[in-house]
Amino acid sequence: TMPAYKDSMLTEARLASASFHKLENDKIEIEFTTKGAQPYTVKIKDYKAYDSTDLYLIKPQASEYGISLFAGENINTKDFVFQVAEHNDSTIIMQLPFAGGGYIQQKFWLESGSYMMQNELSFVNMDGIIPRNVSMLDIDWSVVIPRLEKGYKNEKQYSKLDFYYDGDKKPEEIGRGRDGSERIDT
């Protein structure tokens, strides 16, 4: 059964139908779903997998990205359909509105000639929705990366995820050759 939300706009977003939108540059094509405001597929252009098929870093239904937080009640963004506020070839902005007038915003963009997707998470006018004593949120991203190379053992050993804290010049690394997690307090 679906949980009942105190915020009527969350209930509406939970029941809404998702839509799909693409960002694309000369290097990469990313399809997003509004359900959870997250990447749905990621295709690398000009490269092929070991079996000569298109090279997908993320295939359909192989990724789940959600932000868990307390916003008057416990929520996880993966459960809600966001509204598209802006979309063109290189940028998409999706928002999850709350009845109090605030919203959670996910902005994704691609720059020409780059394989990197940029992401900016914002909490806009959420002062009356997220209590002041809430200083943490959990970002959970689970993704199954398809086999891309013929030598799976070598591929697994050298696969990793890097992320940057705002203002950092050197990336942090999660999980080379294994599952990994990182806790970041806000």
Predicted regions and their residues:
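Soluble non-transmembrane domains of integral membrane proteins
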Residues: 1-8, 13-186
